[in-house]
Design a protein with these regions (language model features):
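Functional transmembrane helices that form membrane-embedded active or gating regions
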Residues: 256-275, 284
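Divalent metal-coordination and catalytic microenvironments
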Residues: 93, 128, 158, 246, ...
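Short active-site segment of divalent metal-dependent hydrolases/proteases
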Residues: 96-97, 135, 249, 269, ...
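Non-catalytic, topology-defining segments of multipass membrane proteins
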Residues: 2-87, 114-224, 287-371
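Transmembrane alpha-helical segments that form the membrane-embedded catalytic/substrate-channel core
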Residues: 83-95, 120, 124, 174-179, ...
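Juxtamembrane helix-capping/reentrant segments at transmembrane boundaries
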Residues: 100-119, 140-155, 253-265
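Long, highly hydrophobic alpha-helical transmembrane signal-anchor segments
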Residues: 77-109, 130
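Membrane-interface elements of multi-pass transporters and channels
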Residues: 72, 95-103, 121, 187, ...
Length: 371
């Protein structure tokens, strides 16, 4: 199944056909397009040195912690591994979007090691690229990363299941309960996998994971400890970033948040807190998201209808006990009425775009992840 990122604003967008798929950037205006092009001509940006340095830091830090854990001590090693494992998941996302190389197979190689344990890189890639169809963003039957349920599915849930969803939709619940629900859904997906490509991904993933656990055991570090004390908390940290990252809105460009988080979170999540910018410019490298956001902060505030938050602490205070209203999807009728505007064309040669989304697309079928 081909994965497409759709162009919503034809006048202010520039397409590029990469790996047989037309991707699109949604610029605020022509001036922003020119500014992004100028930034893209910078040698440092084009060299992708920040991403190469990031890979060295993440891999070096992760394996260094395991090798020298007895010197560091178990407590410090655990804390550092939580950070490096979370960082690795952020790096995998960057690899999916075509960085640091133009070769998807090479990028896949950089992200295939199961340092985060829970899912194969290829399945995450396919699911995430389907998520980037902005015109169906948040829709339960179309967006594999949505937390919304269809009204029919919501009505079928038992009262205790609805209460569980409400609990998950609080900030503490998303961190504590969210990873468990995701893991259960992932295991269910693995057991029900029938597609040969998906089965192959799981076989490779589990084989590599077994080898990684064996090596870890040889270093004297318990794989069980790693799963419980490192991998689960790391997955929980990613739930901080994704908490209320999207909302159901009629306008597709108003469905993604811009979270003005503090620098430690920005670094850990590779600036994906500027999520509206990322969805508008999916090929922009992580080190460009904040710069572009700050240059056009007011424009993005207007574009996404004020969906902006001052940091993750604001979500914590607002949704410590109160659940965010992400359960039954309310529906977005405007998209259905204007679906012709979101038809991707994969036949034509690329235009000159400074930052096309060089996402990999070599899987046979999109694999959905339950949310």
């Amino acid at each position: 199944m081909f994965i497409t990122v759709i162009n919503h604003l034809a006048r202010n967008s520039s397409d590029s056909q990469v790996y047989g798929i037309r991707m699109a950037n949604d610029y605020i205006n022509a001036q922003q397009r020119e500014v992004v092009h100028q930034l893209g001509r910078n040698w440092l940006w084009r060299s992708e040195l920040p991403t190469w340095a990031l890979m060295v830091g993440v891999y070096g830090g992760w394996f260094g912690c395991v090798i020298y854990w007895q010197t560091l001590g178990l407590f410090l090693t655990t804390l550092l591994l939580i950070v490096f494992t979370t960082w690795y998941m952020s790096l995998q996302h960057e690899l999916i979007h075509g960085h640091p190389t133009r070769f998807p197979r090479l990028n896949q190689l950089f992200g295939t090691l199961p340092l985060a344990v829970w899912y194969p890189y290829g399945l995450y890639r396919d699911s995430h690229l389907a998520h980037h169809r902005n015109h169906t963003l948040t829709e339960p039957d179309e967006d594999p990363e949505t937390y919304y349920l269809s009204p029919e599915r919501w009505a079928q849930l038992k009262p205790w299941q609805q209460r569980l969803i409400h609990l998950r939709n609080t900030f503490p619940g998303r961190l504590l309960l969210g990873p468990l629900l995701d893991i259960v859904a992932t295991l269910k997906m693995m057991l029900l996998a029938r597609d040969l490509a998906a089965v192959a991904m799981w076989v490779i993933h589990l084989t590599l994971l077994g080898g990684l656990f064996y090596w870890m055991q040889q270093q004297g570090l318990s794989p069980l400890w790693f799963v419980v004390a490192v991998s689960y908390p790391a997955l929980a940290l990613t739930k901080i970033r994704s908490f209320y990252e999207h909302r159901a809105e009629e306008a597709p460009l108003a469905r993604s948040v811009n979270n003005e988080a503090a620098w430690p979170w920005r670094l850990l999540f590779l600036n994906l807190n500027y999520h509206s910018v990322h969805h508008d410019l999916p090929g922009l490298p992580w080190y460009g998201l904040r710069k572009v956001y700050l240059l056009y902060r007011d424009g993005y505030h207007q574009r996404n209808h004020g969906f902006r938050v001052a940091g993750y602490g604001e979500w914590l205070l607002r949704f410590w006990r109160k659940p965010v209203n992400v359960n039954a999807h309310p529906g977005t009728h405007k998209d259905a009425q204007h679906a012709d505007h979101f038809t991707a064309d994969v036949r034509y040669p690329p235009s000159d775009d400074a930052w096309p989304d060089r996402s990999a697309n070599d899987a046979a079928e999109t694999t959905r992840r339950a949310g």
